[in-house]
């Protein structure tokens, strides 16, 4: 029988709900605002209990919007889809900073690196995102320019936004790609 040595669990930034702080880190209070967030938190807690009885390493990765070719369940993918269908783009908080994305290939590298680590911990949570947050309005403008979008862009009032503190992961592993680098990869992957 082989023993399980490592578990890498894919969770979500949705576990924070609508944070009251502008910057979210691993110590930010979680919130079960959606069924999805509630299920992910229950799974995280089950894994925390699991390690009490077993000798293995558990790493929780709380993911932002994962972008790449054919991604569709996140904010940036919805904008790209609206552009391709020549629909009006609507978004809020153009002056807020945004790094709530990670390119799918970069995520694969992260998982591989964690699977090969020799670090001494039993349970660890990491928020992922891109480094060097950029203003959301700038990000939307870059996407619109890349796809030569000339239709209407509507800015609406929305709840306060946040950006992700990724310092813990970068301290323990490696520097993550910048927001602009991830956005560039996303644009190129969706131009085909």
What residues fall within each predicted segment?
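Active-site helix of classical SDR
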Residues: 35, 39-42
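Structural signature of beta-strand start/N-cap positions in the alpha/beta core
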Residues: 6, 57-59, 124
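C-terminal substrate-binding subdomain of Rossmann-fold SDR/epimerase-dehydratase oxidoreductases
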Residues: 87, 91-94, 99-192
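Conserved Rossmann-fold NAD(P)-dependent oxidoreductase catalytic core, especially the SDR/UDP-sugar
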Residues: 1-35
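Short glycine-/acidic-enriched loop or helix-start segments at secondary-structure transitions
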Residues: 18-20, 70-72, 137-139
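Active-site pre-Tyr helix/loop in NAD(P)-dependent dehydrogenases
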Residues: 12-13, 29, 35, 63-69, ...
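NAD(P)-dependent short-chain dehydrogenase/reductase
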Residues: 45-99, 104, 108, 143
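Hydrophobic positions on the long internal alpha-helix
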Residues: 1, 46-47, 110, 114
